[in-house]
């Protein structure tokens, strides 16, 4: 007990935030200190007009910065799926109108930004994503571009004023519409440690309790430990939630969002192993609640803002993971919030009726009822909870179902609140959690040494604090334009291990997107042979014509897009296009007559593997319940003797123990799909499916034989004992006592003398005569006349 008491603080720090299904929150951006007016914008086409397929340049000035900027742009069709549609819900949550989203109505572009030097030449300085609202001689557009890693956010006057907070910079009051620009560096950088302490004190998140983990005598720890009533033996399961009062949800404000599944994140920094080698697309659904819709003048404005947000965020995913984000479904509610949330859309309610956590749970329940195969769903809202503006379930990419324990509903969902400054960054951040990313380490988590247990992503192997430079920083800040090398390794390794599913990602061929087939979007859609992403992206591609999206003469495939293509020809049969990652993962080879690598295939779940008894295949990995406990929990507490608690073998939640711990700990993470459970069942998304008694007998044959032999032996011994005892009784002569003579008829009853007053006492206290003796048991039967 002394060891357990001293070890519990460390165990808590290592395990309390280990849930792949934990929720992580985002903090509201800092105040905007300065805003510039964008002037003299010119679309450089003959008519100064563009359509959704135009490649063009736009130049403009930022007078107060003495800068002239050019954006070289081309259509970006990635974000809108061919079968994309928008449905409009009424106040009761019923669909009253549904229509496809027409690609030609949305002028969405991507490209690069350039800064004019004093000598008149242009210097490339970053990337750009733009949504053109109006072309002509006085164009209007919104989006983001970067200059030397400093994001510049372009918004219309009306958009800025809709989101403006009291602490944000004011802008001129003009009647006409115009464009403003503010930079990440224009947002006041507050001292993060002080900010977080002030926010934590008013937050419902329990992450602030992590402080007691370094001190076993901390009052919170001491009272929890001394007062808790386990109500079970030392082999019972102690949930860390009940043990320490910790929630399954971890706040971005607190600095911790979960765990990387037992992988040492320092070992995977910068590694793209596990991410797709050829471009893939994550098609998502987005729903907008009444508060979000009410923040716009009309449906079109809200729709355009969402498309622009996805357009901006997709850039960092393409660069980091070779995965673009596309919008397939858009659900819009009425701008008037219902007094009571309708049963069909319980997440659609006024801000004062729920917090962001409740909205995530309700939205997850709704998502589980949708019949689609989207990578995930995002709920757009205008209802922050205090300073919290984002919330996501960790590692739930491709999870279309909903599971939970009564208080939490888990699915592939997140919530994003419309904010002043960096709205697309919040969407990119929460989507990162959905892809399985934990937070970058900051001063608070480094002080707790959480990088050692991979509960945060260190800057590099020698430096812990990432200094707020990247997308997965717990709070928004200046110069955040990319994912950290550690996050890239975090997500890619999770995809490669199948601890985060990737089955919903679309191969870049015949993809159906919201915008319809468009040459130059980098997605090979119906009617196209290839699509290398437009002339600026294709470069000297020898296989694909960038203008027509058709193969060049003699080409039958595109090396840049097809796994079984070499020098524009099909790779020879037998060429390995997807190598095996282990005994349970089968390698795939090219057929010789196709450019597509066959679908990823694994050995059957439950098939024996490895040299150690008890190992079986699960989701393409050779593993076991004990092995997963060792790799997940054991790696954190540095105990190689960790194993799965046998009394919970029907559970698909990791419940582990070790001789040093003595008790079972529930760490709120599921076994891999395909892991054996119960009586012949297999885990699937946290549930044990297919368990039955017959399978249990087969699975535990040795135990059944042993028990049967033991019970059978007891039965044989019992029968022999009865036979021996019977024989002994048969040899014993029973001697009856001599028969008494017949005593004659019973005497007449005495005269009635009143009530009987008590034992052996008659009326008036006289002693009564006792009744005559009853004939003994061995007397002959007596006849009566």
From Swiss-Prot:
Comp. bias regions, Pro residues? 739-752
Q: Where in the cell is it found?
A: Membrane
Give the sugar-modified residues: 322, 329, 355, 561, 593, 640
Q: What class of enzyme is it?
A: hydrolase
MF terms in GO: metal ion binding; metalloendopeptidase activity; metallopeptidase activity
What positions does the domain Peptidase M12B occupy? 279-507
Co-factor requirement: Zn(2+)
Signal peptide as annotated in the record: 1-26
This protein's membrane topology, according to the annotation, is: Single-pass type I membrane protein
- Chain ranges on the Cytoplasmic side, renumbered to this chain: 725-785
Which residues catalyse the reaction?
430
Show the Pfam families listed in the entry: ADAMTS_CR_2, Disintegrin, Reprolysin_5
For this protein, the Enzyme Commission number is: 3.4.24.-
Q: Which InterPro entries match?
A: ADAM_Cys-rich, ADAMTS_CR_2, Disintegrin_dom, Disintegrin_dom_sf, MetalloPept_cat_dom_sf, Peptidase_M12B, ZnMc_ADAM_fungal
S-S bonds: 398-492, 446-464, 577-597
Q: Write down the SMART domains for this protein, in alphabetical order.
A: ACR (SM00608), DISIN (SM00050)
> Does the UniProt entry include the keyword Magnesium?
no
Cofactor: binding details: Binds 1 zinc ion per subunit.
Briefly, what is this protein's role?
Answer: Probable zinc protease.
Going by the UniProt record, its keywords in alphabetical order are: Disulfide bond, Glycoprotein, Hydrolase, Membrane, Metal-binding, Metalloprotease, Protease, Signal, Transmembrane, Transmembrane helix, Zinc
Which Gene Ontology cellular component terms are annotated?
membrane
PANTHER family, per the entry: ADAM A DISINTEGRIN AND METALLOPROTEASE DOMAIN, ADAM METALLOPROTEASE
- Please give the residue ranges the record annotates as the region Disordered: 737-785
- Which segments sit on the Extracellular face? 27-703
Quote the protein name from its UniProt record.
Disintegrin and metalloproteinase domain-containing protein B
């Amino acid at each position: 007990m002394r060891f357990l008491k001293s070890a519990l603080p460390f165990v808590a720090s290592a395990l309390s935030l280990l849930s792949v299904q934990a929720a992580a929150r985002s903090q509201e951006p800092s105040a905007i200190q300065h805003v510039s007016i964008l002037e003299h914008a010119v679309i450089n086409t003959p008519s100064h007009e563009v359509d959704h397929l135009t490649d063009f340049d736009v130049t403009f000035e930022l007078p107060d910065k003495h800068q002239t900027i050019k954006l070289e742009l081309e259509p970006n069709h990635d974000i809108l799926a061919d079968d994309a549609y928008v449905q409009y819900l009424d106040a009761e949550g019923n669909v009253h109108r549904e229509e496809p989203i027409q690609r030609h109505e949305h002028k969405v572009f991507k490209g690069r930004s350039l800064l004019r030097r004093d000598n008149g030449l242009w210097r490339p300085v970053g990337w750009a994503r733009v949504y053109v609202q109006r072309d002509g001689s006085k164009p209007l557009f919104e989006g983001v571009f970067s200059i030397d890693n400093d994001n510049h956010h372009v918004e219309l006057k009306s958009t800025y004023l809709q989101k403006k907070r009291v602490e944000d910079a004011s802008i001129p009051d003009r009647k006409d519409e115009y464009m403003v620009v503010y930079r990440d560096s224009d947002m006041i950088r507050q001292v993060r440690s002080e900010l977080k302490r002030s926010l934590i004190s008013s937050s419902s998140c329990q992450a602030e309790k992590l402080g007691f983990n370094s001190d076993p005598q901390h009052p919170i720890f001491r009272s929890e430990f001394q007062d808790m009533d386990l109500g079970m033996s030392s082999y019972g399961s102690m949930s860390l939630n009940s043990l320490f009062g910790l929630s399954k949800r971890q706040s971005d404000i607190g600095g911790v969002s979960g765990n990387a599944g037992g992988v040492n994140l320092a070992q995977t920094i910068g590694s793209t192993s596990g991410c797709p080698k050829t471009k893939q697309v994550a098609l998502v659904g987005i729903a907008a609640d009444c508060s979000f819709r009410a923040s716009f003048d009309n449906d079109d404005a809200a729709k355009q803002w969402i498309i622009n947000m996805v357009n901006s965020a997709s850039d960092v995913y393409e660069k980091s993971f070779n995965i673009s984000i596309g919008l397939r479904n858009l659900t819009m509610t009425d701008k008037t919030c219902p007094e009571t949330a309708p049963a069909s859309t319980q997440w659609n309610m006024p801000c004062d009726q729920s917090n962001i956590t409740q909205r995530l749970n309700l939205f997850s329940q709704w998502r589980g009822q949708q019949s689609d195969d989207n990578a995930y769903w995002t709920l757009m809202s205008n209802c922050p909870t205090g300073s919290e503006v984002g919330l996501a379930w960790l590692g739930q990419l491709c999870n279309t179902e909903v599971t939970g324990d009564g208080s939490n509903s888990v699915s592939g969902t997140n919530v994003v609140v419309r904010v002043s400054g960096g709205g697309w960054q919040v969407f990119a951040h929460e989507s990162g959690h959905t892809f399985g990313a934990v937070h970058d380490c900051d001063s608070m988590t480094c002080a707790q040494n959480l990088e050692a247990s991979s509960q945060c992503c260190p800057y590099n192997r020698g430096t812990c604090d990432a200094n707020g430079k990247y997308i997965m920083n717990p709070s928004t800040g200046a110069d955040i334009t990319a994912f950290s090398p550690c996050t890239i390794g975090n997500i890619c390794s999770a995809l490669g291990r199948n601890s985060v599913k990737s089955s919903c990602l679309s191969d870049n061929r015949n993809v159906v997107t919201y915008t319809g087939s468009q040459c130059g979007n980098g997605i090979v859609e119906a009617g196209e042979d290839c699509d290398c992403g437009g002339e600026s992206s294709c470069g000297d591609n020898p296989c694909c014509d960038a203008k027509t999206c058709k193969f060049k003469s003699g080409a039958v495939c595109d090396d840049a897009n097809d796994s079984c293509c070499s020098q524009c020809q099909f790779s020879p049969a037998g060429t390995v296009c997807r190598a095996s990652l282990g005994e349970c993962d089968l390698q795939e080879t090219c057929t010789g007559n196709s450019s597509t690598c066959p679908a990823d295939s694994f050995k059957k779940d439950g098939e024996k593997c490895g040299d150690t008894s008890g190992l079986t295949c699960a989701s393409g990995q050779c593993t076991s319940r004990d092995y997963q406990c060792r790799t997940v929990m054991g790696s954190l507490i540095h105990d190689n003797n960790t194993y799965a608690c046998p009394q919970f073998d029907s559970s698909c939640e990791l419940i582990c123990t070790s001789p040093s711990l003595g008790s079972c700990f529930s760490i709120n993470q599921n076994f891999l799909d395909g892991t054996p459970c119960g009586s012949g069942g297999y885990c699937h998304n946290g549930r044990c499916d297919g368990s039955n008694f017959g399978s249990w007998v087969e699975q535990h044959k040795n135990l059944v034989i042993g028990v049967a032999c033991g019970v059978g032996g007891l039965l044989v011994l019992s029968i022999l004992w009865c036979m021996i005892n019977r024989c002994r009784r048969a040899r014993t002569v029973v001697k009856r006592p001599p028969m008494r003579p017949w005593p004659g008829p019973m005497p007449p009853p005495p005269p009635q003398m009143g009530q009987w007053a008590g034992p052996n006492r008659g009326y008036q206290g006289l002693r009564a005569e006792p009744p005559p003796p009853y004939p003994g048991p061995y007397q002959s039967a007596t006849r009566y006349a």
